[in-house]
Amino acid sequence: MNAKELIARRIAMELHDGDIVNLGIGLPTQVVNYLPDNVNITLQSENGFLGLTAFDPENANSNLVNAGGQPCGIKKGGSTFDSAFSFALIRGGHVDACVLGGLEVDQEANLANWMVPGKMVPGMGGAMDLVTGAKKVIIGMEHCAKSGSSKILKKCTLPLTASKKVAMVVTELAVFNFIEGRLVLKEHAPHVDLETIKAKTEADFIVADDFKEMQISQKGLEL
């Protein structure tokens, strides 16, 4: 199991039956693959859909694409609307959770996930609205950058997407929650010890009294 799959499997355990959820592009889209059988969520997309499903080549519709431009479907009872209504849903607090990738998260619950200096980017898209309007903001990302440096920092160095909005960070090493303004280490991945997490995390954090091993979705792993 690779790092991204582990992260997606853990985040899948965080969603609840009946939730309206927005999944960012990249790693977050994998979360739906690992939802427990008793959890049914409704996917919302910034470009005007409620009730997105996976792409079905037998019932393809060129008008159905998600916010990342990827082909998709829409479930029975799903709805379509313009972007103004879509963002009204988001800004109005009707999205239960959003799952986004991250470039940096710091100990003050700040998120940077849209710009890398020196690279051309189109802008942050709907992420700015999602992190402000969603009831819970979950960041799924690898713990360290390709250079080996920590992505969980004392202070973000990249331009921020949002300030003090992150509720939870899931990496291949650990799960952190922001509780009363403090970064709290709640879980460790299997075969990962506390010292490893400390060595790979720049941010200051406290260890939860109930610090435990991460539990992940077993969907597809059953023999």
From Swiss-Prot:
The lineage of its organism: Bacteria, Pseudomonadati, Pseudomonadota, Gammaproteobacteria, Pasteurellales. Heterotetramer composed of two alpha subunits (AtoD) and two beta subunits (AtoA). The keyword Protein transport does not apply. Pfam families: CoA_trans. It is an enzyme of class 2 (transferase). GO terms for molecular function: acetate CoA-transferase activity. The keyword Signal does not apply. One of its GO terms (biological process) is short-chain fatty acid metabolic process. The gene is atoA. This is Acetate CoA-transferase subunit beta. The active site is at residue 46. It catalyses: an acyl-CoA + acetate = a carboxylate + acetyl-CoA; acetoacetate + acetyl-CoA = acetoacetyl-CoA + acetate. Belongs to the 3-oxoacid CoA-transferase subunit B family.
